[in-house]
């Protein structure tokens, strides 16, 4: 067991004999008596079999690059200055948000919880609700399209989902009217990102639209990585500029492919390292997110809703005692902007 407390004394109180066999240091060596072992070298040996197996699954030379970068891409975090680590204060409100999903979507419950935490009245909207006209989004202020594998990705990621909007008049009218309103916000995460990109909702004035392509590795990637948030016009990222935060990414077609130069796009966040596996998909310009020109609409491949609490993270700074992670600021920003508008 590893603990900051004196566990030996605690065990002895209950008559259990315990012996301390070592202590941690800041060095990257393992010392056992006169034996000195380099932890990075031992880790490389330990991972050799996995790396060999991965070479048969992953497009070359990314399996080798992963093995080389495993010690070159340490997680580094820089938290927002305005973040206090406290849960948002409950609000009395009438600001309505919707989580839109399709057959095969997931993480809608985590997303709804995160939105509710910031004060939104959250409604669950399935595509059948939009197609049949039970929902039209007219009273919705914030629309969030969630992740998953809509229609099992049979036609490609979000292709079928986008088709459900394009070729069903009521659903098409609902989404178009929502995005034409000047007082709304939206977020597309993972499959939702692929959806909004496929529909051309983030860069509507571009003749050539961005595309979401298969990961460079040629396989599904799931990794706890980190993104650095840049200064941008993205409304819901206000106050997060300059921060580097941990986040889960899990997708098979997460590569942003941009037909124009970077200056033509609003890219508010990039992966901490541009190389694989920190950038799990090989996105152009190392992009992790993309925002509309006016900053009201944002898409991202990583899953912020899977990093709500410190214990959701693959690693969280041990010198902090936060109740929630900085990602809750996203929906706090959304709520505040909409509240001021109303």
Model-based region annotation:
Residues 149-234:
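Cysteine-nucleophile active-site neighborhood
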Residues 10-36, 123-129, 210-219, 270-272:
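Beta-strand->loop->alpha-helix junctions that form or flank phosphate-binding loops
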Residues 21, 134-135, 176-177, 209-342:
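Amide-donor transfer/coupling interface in amidating biosynthetic enzymes
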Residues 1-2, 19-24, 33, 100-102, ...:
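Generic beta-strand/beta-sheet core signal
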Residues 3-96, 104:
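Intein/HINT protein-splicing elements and their conserved insertion hotspots or analogous self-processing inserts
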Residues 136-144:
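Short acidic/histidine-rich motifs immediately flanking catalytic phosphotransfer sites
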Residues 94-96, 121, 246:
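Residues that mark the start of a beta-strand
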């Amino acid at each position: 067991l590893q603990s900051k407390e004196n566990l030996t004394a605690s065990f002895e109180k209950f008559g259990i004999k315990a012996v301390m066999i070592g202590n941690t240091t800041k060095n990257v060596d393992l010392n056992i008596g006169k034996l000195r072992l380099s932890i990075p070298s031992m880790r490389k040996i330990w991972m050799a079999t996995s790396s060999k197996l991965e070479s048969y699954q992953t497009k070359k030379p990314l399996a080798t690059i992963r093995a080389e970068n495993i010690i070159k891409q340490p997680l580094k975090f820089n938290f927002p200055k305005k973040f206090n680590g406290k849960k948002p204060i409950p609000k009395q409100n009438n600001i309505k948000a919707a989580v839109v999903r399709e057959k095969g979507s997931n993480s809608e419950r985590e997303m709804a919880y995160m939105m509710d935490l910031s004060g939104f009245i959250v409604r669950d909207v399935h595509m059948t609700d939009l197609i049949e006209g039970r929902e039209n989004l007219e009273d919705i202020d914030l629309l969030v399209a969630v992740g998953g594998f809509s229609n099992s990705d049979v036609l490609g990621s979000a292709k079928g989902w986008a088709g459900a909007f394009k070729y069903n008049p009521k659903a098409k009218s609902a989404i178009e009217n929502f995005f034409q309103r000047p007082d709304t916000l939206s977020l597309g995460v993972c499959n939702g990102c692929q959806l909004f990109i496929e529909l051309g909702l983030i860069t509507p004035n571009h003749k050539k639209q961005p595309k979401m392509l298969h990961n460079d590795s040629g396989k599904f990637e799931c990794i706890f990585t980190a993104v650095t948030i840049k200064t941008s016009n993205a409304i819901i990222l206000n106050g997060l500029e300059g921060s580097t935060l941990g986040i889960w990414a899990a997708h098979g077609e997460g590569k942003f492919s941009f037909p124009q130069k970077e200056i033509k796009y609003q890219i508010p966040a990039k992966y901490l390292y541009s190389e694989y596996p920190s950038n799990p998909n090989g996105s152009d310009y190392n992009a992790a997110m993309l925002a509309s020109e006016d900053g009201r609409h944002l898409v991202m491949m990583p899953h912020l809703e899977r990093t709500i609490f410190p214990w959701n993270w693959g690693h969280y700074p041990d010198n902090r005692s936060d109740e929630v992670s900085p990602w809750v600021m996203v929906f706090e920003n959304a709520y505040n902007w909409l509240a001021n508008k109303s």
